[in-house]
Amino acid sequence: MLEKMGIVVAFLISLTVLTINSLTIVEKVRNLKNGTSKKKKRIRKRLRPKRQRQRIRR
């Protein structure tokens, strides 16, 4: 029984990893098609440190 459970768990883990990878690939493809989402991400990265600085000052 333990061996069967281990095999089932291994299959579930592999399936979840594959689904996550496929979702990330789909997002990357959409970003390449749009080209705007990448710019937004860069702007967000620039704004984050400024917000942190303001918190430190307060």
From Swiss-Prot:
It is a single-pass membrane protein. It is found in: Cell membrane. It comes from the Bacteria. Residues 35-58 are annotated as: Disordered. Keywords: Cell membrane, Membrane, Transmembrane, Transmembrane helix. GO terms for cellular component: plasma membrane. The chain crosses the membrane at residues 6-26. Residues 36-58 have a biased composition (Basic residues). This is SPbeta prophage-derived uncharacterized protein YonT. It comes from Bacillus subtilis (strain 168). The gene is yonT.
